[in-house]
Design a protein with these regions (language model features):
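An anion-binding catalytic pocket shared by soluble metabolic enzymes
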Residues: 2-17, 107, 111-190, 282-307
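Terminal domain-start leader segments
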Residues: 1-12, 69-118, 122
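Small-residue-rich
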Residues: 37-66
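A generic N-terminal leader/anchor concept
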Residues: 1-43, 47
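Conserved hydrophobic core element of enzyme catalytic domains
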Residues: 228-337
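Surface-exposed flexible segments
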Residues: 17-32, 51-59, 148-159
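Contiguous alpha-helical scaffold segments within structured protein domains
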Residues: 59-82, 87-89, 111-113, 162-264, ...
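A residue-level signal for conserved active-site and pocket-lining positions in enzyme catalytic cores
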Residues: 40, 98, 154, 193, ...
Length: 337
């Protein structure tokens, strides 16, 4: 099946079932179907009134597909630091006042893909990446997005819930310094501790020790958590409990801090789906990714968005460099110029 010719589609890599492609026409619904497959595709704000996208057909794709097409020519525009610097200053002011522990500004870089290439080719580049990443995509005739994320929001099987804290970033060659970096350790532990505190009232939670996850171009701290829930809940219950984790949201997480984060993201022109949950449901098994390491398009215009955690010990120069490092990593992941 040639993804480039499909006018609409949804794709995800499931941990046990591999690559799954949903084809249209899609039926959209506020509730999941009683049976059959469905994709959960929402915005970061969780404000899509019909986030369940129910495909007309579901296809299992081979792990080794066709090689990606030749690299397209993309004219990128470097993002200006001015708007980011203003948002960063406001965050640091709130952290100093004790109103915030952490927040995550996200800023896009824009580009134009030149014809005859089309952005749907990016999906083919996503599905050919390493086994430690999860490709995902959603597109219509004129717009869409796709990504290659290492981060899962959770995997629900009955009352069992598996999730992860993924925060703290460095280059692989800096691992010796990274494992002793107080700023990166603090950023990670805020995320892990927040997830643990949200899950603990729901049942029995086990947590692994913090470790380093090497993704080739970047390394991160990772902690895995497993919940045996006292009660059965719907996927949307867990989405609203866990999203956004402090890896992409604010800590403390309140209506006020989330509204402020939404304002910061809007001012930085962050795509609505960046960092949003992206999931797949079938037969009571729900697997949900965190929509990062992604590219968004309308027509031939692209947006490559990255975010980075800001805590009390953050500096503007360090955070701006980290955002560029992450953008370069996304481009390398897609093998783009």
């Amino acid at each position: 099946m040639d993804i480039k010719t499909l006018t609409s589609g949804a794709l995800i890599k499931h941990p046990s079932r591999g690559l799954l492609l949903g084809t249209g026409p899609f039926r959209e619904s506020a509730e999941p179907p009683d049976s059959g497959p469905a994709f959960y595709i929402d915005t970061f704000r969780l404000d899509d009134p019909q986030p369940w996208k129910i495909p007309a057909a579901l296809h299992a794709l081979p792990a080794e597909g066709n090689p990606p097409p030749p690299a397209p020519e993309i004219r990128w525009t470097e993002p200006s630091p001015d708007a980011y610097a203003q948002v960063f200053a406001e965050m640091m002011e709130q952290i100093a006042a004790g109103q915030l522990m952490k927040s995550v500004p996200a800023i896009p870089q824009f580009g134009e893909m030149l014809l005859p290439h089309t952005p749907r080719e990016l999906i083919l580049r996503a599905v050919s990446r390493s086994p430690s990443h999860y490709p995902y995509a959603w597109w219509t005739e004129r717009e869409g997005f796709c990504g290659i994320t290492p981060e899962t929001l959770f995997h629900q099987q009955g009352r069992r819930l598996e999730t992860m804290a993924l925060a703290g970033t460095a280059r692989p060659e800096d691992e010796g310094v990274f494992i002793n970096d107080d700023k990166e350790i603090r950023e990670h532990e805020i995320v892990a501790g927040s997830i643990l505190s949200r899950l603990s009232p729901c049942g029995s939670v086990t947590r692994t020790a913090r470790s380093v996850l090497n993704l080739g171009t970047l390394i991160h701290f990772v902690t895995y958590l497993t919940l045996e829930s006292d009660e059965q809940h719907t996927p949307v219950h867990w989405i609203r409990l866990l999203h956004p984790t402090p890896a992409l949201g604010s800590q403390p997480r309140t209506e006020k801090t989330l509204a402020q984060l939404d304002d910061w993201r809007s001012r930085l022109r962050c795509p609505l789906h960046f960092g949003a949950p992206f999931g797949f449901l079938e037969n009571g098994d729900f697997f949900c990714l965190v929509g990062i390491r992604s590219l968004y398009w309308q027509g031939q215009r692209l947006a490559l968005c990255t975010g980075g955690g800001v805590v009390a010990s953050s500096t503007l120069t360090h955070e701006w460099r980290e955002l560029k490092l992450k953008r370069d990593t996304v481009r390398r992941s897609f093998r783009l110029p």
